[in-house]
Amino acid sequence: MKRYDRFVDFYEAYLKMHSHPTNRRLHLLGNALAIGALVYAIAQRNPWALFAMPAFASGLAFIGHRFFQKNKPGVLHYPVWGTLGNWVMTKDVLLGKLKW
């Protein structure tokens, strides 16, 4: 993977790695379930439920990459920017900047 010094450059490549609609939808579903796990953990005062957050988000993302996009996730090379890109992509879809 190419080296990136700025997030905006990385995000442009990130979107290309997430061009398949099903892959993108699985990422968004994983994020929604992760937020649900966070809400549940807070509401039930159950810190163990927090372990479901990365399982939901990463698990569905890896399925999307493996079976639909057929590539390797950018988060493996850029863990912080890959995670940030995931949430920025979710925001962009919710705001209508990216196609669902």
List PLM regions with ranges.
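Alpha-helical transmembrane segments of integral membrane proteins
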Residues: 23-26, 48-53, 81
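Core segments of transmembrane alpha-helices
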Residues: 26-40
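Structural signal for membrane-spanning alpha-helices in multi-pass inner-membrane proteins
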Residues: 38-41, 64-65, 93
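Transmembrane alpha-helical segments that form the membrane-embedded catalytic/substrate-channel core
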Residues: 55-69
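Helix-coil boundary and interhelical linker segments in multi-pass alpha-helical membrane proteins
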Residues: 39-50
